Design a protein with these regions (language model features):
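Conserved donor NDP-sugar-binding/catalytic core segment of glycosyltransferases
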Residues: 20-50
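A recurrent flexible, glycine/aromatic-enriched loop bordering the glycosyltransferase active site
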Residues: 58-77
Length: 138
């Protein structure tokens, strides 16, 4: 609610962004798309699985060597969409709830094919369980 920019996104404090993340995202904002999507790696126990976040996937699903996801909290989304789809007041599954809501409003995207985000899963610190179908990546 306190944001003042045209777009809103979340970077989890235990994840890593690519050195060119800001340059690529800021350049993409001129497209005026509802959401900026990108690729990255899901990292668990030093094993990396590539992922792609895009509207073209039409759902969240896993292949043995690739995760496909719809736009979610990691993607810059227009502020007015984010405000109409606020996070629910809970600390488990709130990101999945938000993703489901924003995908009802998003009409177009600007996709960056580069790996910009590295989702660092640690079973010792994460509240997300590996077999949870609501998780952003599992």
């Amino acid at each position: 609610n306190k944001s003042c920019g045209r777009y809103v996104c979340f970077i989890d404090d235990d994840d890593v962004i690519a050195p060119n993340y800001l340059i690529k995202i800021i350049s993409a904002l001129s497209s005026n798309a509802d959401v900026i999507t990108f690729c990255g790696d899901y990292v668990e126990n030093n094993l990396r699985t590539p992922f792609s976040i895009s509207m073209v996937h039409r759902g969240n699903f896993n292949h043995p060597n690739m995760f496909y996801r719809l736009p979610n909290h990691l993607c810059p989304v227009k502020r007015e969409i984010a405000l109409s789809c606020q996070f629910t007041d809970k600390n488990y599954g709130e990101d999945s709830d938000y993703a489901e809501k924003i995908n009802n409003y998003i009409k177009n995207e600007f996709h960056i094919q580069d790996k910009l985000y590295f989702y660092m899963y640690d079973s010792n610190t994460s509240q997300t369980k590996p077999n949870n179908t609501l998780n952003a990546f599992n």
